[in-house]
Design a protein with these regions (language model features):
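Intrinsically disordered, low-complexity terminal regulatory regions
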Residues: 2-142
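Feature detects long, helix-prone N-terminal segments enriched in hydrophobes
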Residues: 165-169, 194, 206, 240-243
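Juxtadomain coupling helices with adjacent low-complexity linkers
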Residues: 23, 27-28, 32-44, 51, ...
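A short, aliphatic-rich beta-strand micro-motif
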Residues: 197-205
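Sensory-domain boundary capping and coupling elements
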Residues: 204-218
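Short loop/turn motifs at secondary-structure junctions and domain boundaries
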Residues: 117, 190-195
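Short hydrophobic/aromatic beta-strand element in the GNAT-like acyltransferase core
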Residues: 122, 200, 213
Length: 244
């Protein structure tokens, strides 16, 4: 995947008051790379709350299989409301080891946290993986309606996919009015026609390479305010620790 040189902007320790300087550096780096304008102090507060939740909560069960929609001609679009007979098996792409099971359980725990904190209508975590068909985004954990499990990481698919565009560009996208965004010619992959707003954010490893994305969808316009975005970014900083 394309690598980009990043000029990092460091926030001094006192800028985040009672929060750790390391967290402040991670937050500032993330915002710089993803090109997002969100209050770093608010993200630091949400990150601290997330870490407290992870430490105190019991891990949920892992969903190794899930239903997926039928795909339209050429496999480009989901046929909303029509499900395939056979469930998608995550084990076709992820080994069912105890270590991977614990990581996936932690990811599902974060998904549950997002739902509790934001009441978002759909949320998913995707990891960039190599498949027989080439590099793709693989859905590891989610909540909401059935959706496609894999997105090809190609420039051609990015022309109609917000998820792939974010993964390839490493830039976050916040769309608080999908209808207006489409009318202006924006790239968008429509799965659920009820979706009115969407935020898609990249996930980075320690080398600042994009290793996946998160996707959040809401059934109302202007859903993603500063606090909701801070929760999402806090989780994006934590999620890479649990990728498989």
């Amino acid at each position: 995947m394309l690598q980009v040189a990043i000029a990092q902007k460091k926030f001094p320790c006192y800028y985040l008051e009672n929060f750790r300087c390391m967290d402040g550096q991670m937050i500032s780096s993330y915002l710089d790379i993803a090109q997002l304008n969100i209050d770093p102090q608010l993200i630091a507060k949400e990150l601290k709350q997330l870490e407290q939740y992870i430490a105190a909560s019991a891990l949920p069960s892992v969903r190794w299989e899930y239903q997926i929609p039928e795909l339209g001609e050429g496999g480009a679009c989901s046929l909303f409301g029509y499900l395939q007979d056979e469930p998608f098996k995550l084990t076709d792409h992820v080994s069912a080891t105890s270590q991977n099971e614990q990581k996936l359980a932690n990811l599902q725990n974060i998904v549950n946290y997002i739902e509790q904190q934001t009441q978002v209508d759909w949320y998913g975590i995707y990891q960039a993986v190599d498949t027989a068909e080439g590099p793709q985004l693989l859905k590891l954990a989610y909540q909401g309606a059935p959706s496609r499990p894999l997105f090809p990481l190609t420039e051609a698919f990015a022309a109609g996919s917000n998820n792939v565009q974010v993964a390839l560009s490493k830039r976050g996208r916040v769309i608080n009015n999908v209808e207006n965004y489409l009318a202006q010619g924006g790239e968008y992959y429509t799965c659920d026609p009820k979706v009115k707003a969407e935020t898609c954010l990249p996930l980075f490893n320690e080398q600042h390479e994009c290793v996946g994305i998160i996707d959040a969808e809401a059934f109302s316009n202007d859903f993603f305010d500063s606090r909701t975005l801070a929760v999402l970014v806090a989780c994006c900083i934590k999620i890479p620790h649990f990728l498989v």
